Amino acid sequence: MRQVAYSTFTIIRILDNKMAHIIQFDNPATIVLRRGELFDYPKLTRVISGKTIWESTFPIEVDDVFIAMSDGAEYAGVGQELNFGWTRDSIADYAIANYLPENSAKSTASIIIDECNRLYEGRPGDDTTIAVARVRNRHPVNLVVGPPEHKEDDVRMMNLFFAKEGTKIVCGGTTSNVVSRYLHQPIIASLDYHDPEIPPISQIKGVDLTTEGVITLAKVLAYAEDFLDQAKLASVWAVQKDGASLIAKELFENATDINFFVGRAINPAHQNPNLPITFGIKQQLITSLADCLKRMGKHIRLSYF
């Protein structure tokens, strides 16, 4: 063995939400997608201690996607499905073919790494790392669950909830009634069960999504915990139309800032000792979900009433 220390690296910095600064050494060149097409960004070279460093600085645009990778990605398929491996250009073509403006950075990385794993036939011959960053505008989401502990606080809670900018999600039957009275709009119920385990969603004019409460949020929490692990269930909630899946997609992929409005009123049904532990006090459920969302990099604010 040569016993020589060796390291490749890719550094991507976003400066003042205006400029991208990329520094690269011996990794495949970072792929940048702009408006779904390959963006040929400027590159300068700098030699340090005999090593050539590539450096780039350029203005960013909303929805720019940065895809950095180790050389294991280029070696995927060598001697198996592909004679010369999966080249950077081929990886860029694959990313473009699978590009959707709404795709999160995580989903884009998963799409590419899954294809690498397929080309390696599940037996990677080299370290294979994909890192993705996406430039986006902030997207606030506001979620209210449970009525206030004191009924006289209903209007105050609703005033604060509807004063917030962003998507509005209402969880729980009693909460929906409070919102319905406040907006003077009827609740339009649905009997469409997209998932037999999740109660159907409803419609209230002025609200983006109306769902059942604890059962639905318990499922969202399960999805969140899985998402932070191996995201094996992401293929379920990404396409399903039940309340838990719709909330998961909004919170995990779309939201940047999430405001929870949590009523402290206790629903006696949730105190049934025969129900699983996830059906305990809703504050515990929301706290656990908020912790997961913080680990996803979301900005969280909890308000109790």
Residue ranges and their predicted role:
Residues 28-57, 210-216, 222, 230-235:
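PP2C/PPM family metal-dependent serine/threonine protein phosphatase catalytic domain
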Residues 65-115, 268-275:
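Active-site-proximal, acidic helix/loop segment immediately C-terminal to a metal-coordinating Asp/Glu
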Residues 137-167, 176, 180-305:
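Non-transmembrane, aqueous-exposed alpha-helical and coiled segments at domain scale
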Residues 45-56, 113-114, 149-156:
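Active-site glycine-rich loop that binds ribose-phosphate moieties when present
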Residues 5-9, 40-79:
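Acidic loop->beta-strand submotif enriched in PP2C/PPM serine/threonine phosphatases
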Residues 24-25, 59-82, 133, 171-175, ...:
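Conserved beta-strand-loop-short alpha-helix elements that form
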Residues 10-11, 20, 54-58, 117-122, ...:
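A generic local secondary-structure boundary/capping motif
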